[in-house]
């Protein structure tokens, strides 16, 4: 939740420009990836398959359109089915990973939608003509151990200034990495650590010469959670939050230990809140109290983290039918009092982590309901689109968290507004916030694609360019005139349903802004009809911020 991320990053491999939506001779709506000259979103009546397996529809369509996709071989040999589900509208949604001789192609995924036996949409970019890539013919000369050593040494020299204590070792896999119109054999190395500063770095190391092709910090990759639940009776305690407001919270009483614990057994697999005790070891100790009265000042951050995690769970369940962040009722774990004066909050892949702030720039981060909603939405994104935390896909990742963090705030009706982090940012300055969805320029963020940040700081502007999508979401909900474009608002509820459907069922790891527009248009058509006002409003909202 930094106002500006301080870490730079090399540009992501995928071309982020896409041509405006067009129509093929067959009546299909197509968005093109400008760099690779391949479709990144196709919708329409693509192919009817009768009684055959649904994945065969996708293989047949891609093979039929081989002149467009140019995979250089049979689709079934190049696309591996990695997931299949039925959504709320009865569509079958399948996700495929592109592979080359069995090696995954970094960042590629194809999401396919089948309705009543007919293929109606494909989203995601594929890399063409890999057989003709000369760099892929070079022999692998770098070992896994050497790649990991290169990444850790670079972290030491450029990030931590001392050798970090890594967690669970490094995770490394061999990939095909597309970059600058070419593709290379590379290692994807994940280096995770909590000290001396938290980091979750992704490195792309050329497997033929050891060069660092890309690197970025992404604090949301998988790592195991810790801490054990207690057996006992569900109870209701009372506490005071960071802002001094009283809250009733679900707790557990253990007669064996004689304590009350911040363990909520009423939601999914439980909500657990831990005391980090100003250290940097996770998860810490399950929060305890002797009388079920969590009213001490030290309790405040834990009270809010626990209570607001329950609100976020309820929002996703009651509004979107989603059971916890993974859709399967995963336990929600939060640690407060992480480090000393730590000015951040993050999702680490298995749990939430909240710093106390320094008291001047930030209050304890769990005191902002939109902050809690924001960070837990990163977990939802982690389990759905998996948006790469860099450049436009990273800005979409951040915008989704802002959008749903704000919608959670409205759901709870706790002084809701369109500002982000206003409750915990600069407590001595009235009316200040981290970002604004209604007026991104208020805090120096762009509100139109023509004003986007194009540098490498902040992972390519993930916290900056999110303002463009935030403004589109605000306009879609509330309506208005922006840069001379009139938008008819459809309300928060419909806006949220459209963005949720786009996130969960259409976006893929390297989706850019144009693909997000296409995904939202298709989501609105799915929900409200292709000729509906909602579809028109989505188009108006993205037109208003210059995204086509």
Swiss-Prot record:
Could you say which residues bind Ca(2+) 1 here?
Answer: 289, 291, 293
InterPro entries associated with the record: FTP_domain, PepSY, Peptidase_M4, Peptidase_M4/M1_CTD_sf, Peptidase_M4_C_domain, Peptidase_M4_domain, Zinc_Metalloprotease_M4
Q: What does this protein do?
A: Extracellular zinc metalloprotease.
Task: Name the chain's protein.
Answer: Thermostable neutral protease NprT
Main site of residence?
secreted
- Comment on pH dependence: Optimum pH is about 7.
Names of required cofactors:
Ca(2+); Zn(2+)
EC number(s) on file = 3.4.24.-
From what organism does this protein derive? Geobacillus stearothermophilus
Ways its activity is controlled = Its casein hydrolytic activity is inhibited almost completely by a chelating agent (EDTA), whereas neither diisopropyl fluorophosphate nor phenylmethylsulfonyl fluoride inhibit the proteolytic activity in vitro.
Location within or outside the cell: Secreted
| Maturation propeptide residues | 26-229
Pfam families attached to this UniProt entry: FTP, PepSY, Peptidase_M4, Peptidase_M4_C
């Amino acid at each position: 939740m930094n106002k500006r991320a301080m870490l730079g990053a090399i540009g992501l491999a995928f071309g982020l420009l896409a041509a405006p939506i067009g129509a093929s001779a067959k009546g299909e709506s197509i968005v093109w990836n400008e760099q690779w000259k391949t479709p990144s979103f196709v919708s329409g009546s693509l192919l009817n398959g009768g009684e055959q397996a649904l994945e065969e529809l996708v293989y047949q369509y891609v093979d039929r359109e081989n002149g467009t996709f140019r995979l250089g071989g049979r689709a079934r040999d190049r696309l591996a089915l990695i997931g299949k589900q039925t959504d709320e509208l009865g569509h079958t949604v399948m996700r495929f990973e592109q592979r080359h001789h069995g090696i995954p192609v970094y960042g590629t995924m194809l999401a396919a939608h089948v309705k009543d036996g007919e293929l109606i949409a494909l989203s995601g970019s594929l890399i063409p003509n890999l057989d003709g890539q000369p760099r892929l013919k070079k022999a692998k000369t770098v070992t896994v151990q050497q790649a990991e050593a290169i990444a850790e040494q670079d972290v030491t020299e450029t990030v931590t200034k001392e050798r970090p204590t890594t967690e669970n070792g490094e995770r490394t896999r061999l990939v095909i990495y597309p970059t600058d119109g070419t593709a290379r054999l590379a290692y994807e190395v994940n280096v995770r650590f909590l000290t001396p500063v938290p980091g979750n770095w992704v490195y792309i190391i050329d497997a033929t010469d050891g060069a660092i092709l890309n690197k970025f910090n992404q604090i949301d990759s998988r790592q195991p959670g810790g801490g054990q639940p207690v057996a006992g009776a569900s109870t209701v305690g009372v506490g005071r939050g960071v802002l001094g407001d009283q809250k009733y919270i679900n707790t557990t009483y253990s007669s064996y230990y004689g304590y009350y614990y911040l363990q909520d057994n009423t939601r999914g697999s439980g909500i657990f809140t831990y005391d980090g005790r100003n250290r940097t070891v996770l998860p810490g100790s399950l929060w305890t109290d002797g009388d079920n009265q969590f009213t001490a000042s030290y309790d405040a951050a834990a009270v809010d983290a626990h209570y607001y995690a329950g609100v976020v769970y309820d929002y996703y369940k009651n509004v979107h039918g989603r059971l916890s962040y993974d859709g399967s009722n995963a336990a929600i774990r939060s640690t407060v009092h992480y480090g000393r004066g730590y000015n951040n909050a993050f999702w680490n892949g298995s749990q939430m982590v909240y710093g106390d702030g320094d008291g001047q720039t930030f209050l304890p981060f769990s005191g902002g309901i939109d902050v809690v909603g924001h960070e837990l939405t990163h977990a939802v994104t982690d389990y759905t689109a998996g948006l790469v935390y860099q450049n436009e896909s990273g800005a979409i990742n951040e915008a989704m968290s802002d959008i749903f963090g704000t919608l959670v705030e409205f759901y709870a009706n706790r002084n809701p507004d369109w500002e982000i982090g206003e409750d915990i940012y600069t407590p001595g300055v009235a009316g200040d916030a981290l970002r604004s969805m209604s007026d991104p320029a208020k805090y120096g963020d762009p509100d139109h694609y023509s004003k986007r940040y194009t540098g490498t700081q902040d992972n390519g502007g993930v916290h900056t360019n999110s303002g463009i999508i935030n403004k589109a979401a605000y306009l879609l909900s509330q309506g208005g005139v922006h840069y001379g474009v009139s938008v008819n608002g459809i309300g928060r509820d419909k806006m949220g349903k459209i963005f949720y459907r786009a996130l969960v069922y259409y976006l893929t790891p390297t989706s850019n802004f144009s693909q997000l527009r296409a995904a939202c248009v298709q989501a609105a058509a799915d929900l409200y009809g292709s000729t509906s006002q909602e579809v028109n409003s989505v188009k108006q909202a993205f037109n208003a911020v210059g995204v086509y």
